[in-house]
């Protein structure tokens, strides 16, 4: 007989830094087991924010799926800024290249709703614009 799903939660933790806390307690899962497995699974992504989808079952067991780091976080890292513009229409806080956008889009491709790398790049460019980050090299991009 299949296990009964009690809850599905989408959370974000820093890689290798998941700790038992209120957000995990509310799921009713074995918190030490989750934190150990999550931290082991994210060893190669140290310093990044890692979104995770946790499926909790009625017997306190769980499954989880790691997602790619959010585009906004990656853009801030590439642009070397702490936060985006408070008003992206009038402020520009940083500049990134189209090559930076391409590398982020290639990394994010599995989690994006895009069929081509160009479509993925357009989504990342939209995120950059909303953060007040200017993209250089747009004249080559259609």
Swiss-Prot record:
GO molecular function: large ribosomal subunit rRNA binding; structural constituent of ribosome
Cytoplasm as UniProt keyword: no
HAMAP family in alphabetical order: Ribosomal_uL11 (MF_00736)
Post-translational modification: One or more lysine residues are methylated.
Taxonomy of the source species: Bacteria, Bacillati, Mycoplasmatota, Mollicutes, Mycoplasmataceae
Primary role: Forms part of the ribosomal stalk which helps the ribosome interact with GTP-bound translation factors.
Name of the protein described by the UniProt record: Large ribosomal subunit protein uL11
Keyword Ribonucleoprotein attributed: yes
UniProt keyword annotations, A-Z: Methylation, Ribonucleoprotein, Ribosomal protein, RNA-binding, rRNA-binding
Database matches in NCBIfam families: L11_bact
Subunit comment: Part of the ribosomal stalk of the 50S ribosomal subunit. Interacts with L10 and the large rRNA to form the base of the stalk. L10 forms an elongated spine to which L12 dimers bind in a sequential fashion forming a multimeric L10(L12)X complex.
Gene Ontology cellular-component annotations: cytosolic large ribosomal subunit
Organism: Mycoplasma capricolum subsp. capricolum (strain California kid / ATCC 27343 / NCTC 10154)
GO biological process, one term: translation
Record-stated family: Belongs to the universal ribosomal protein uL11 family.
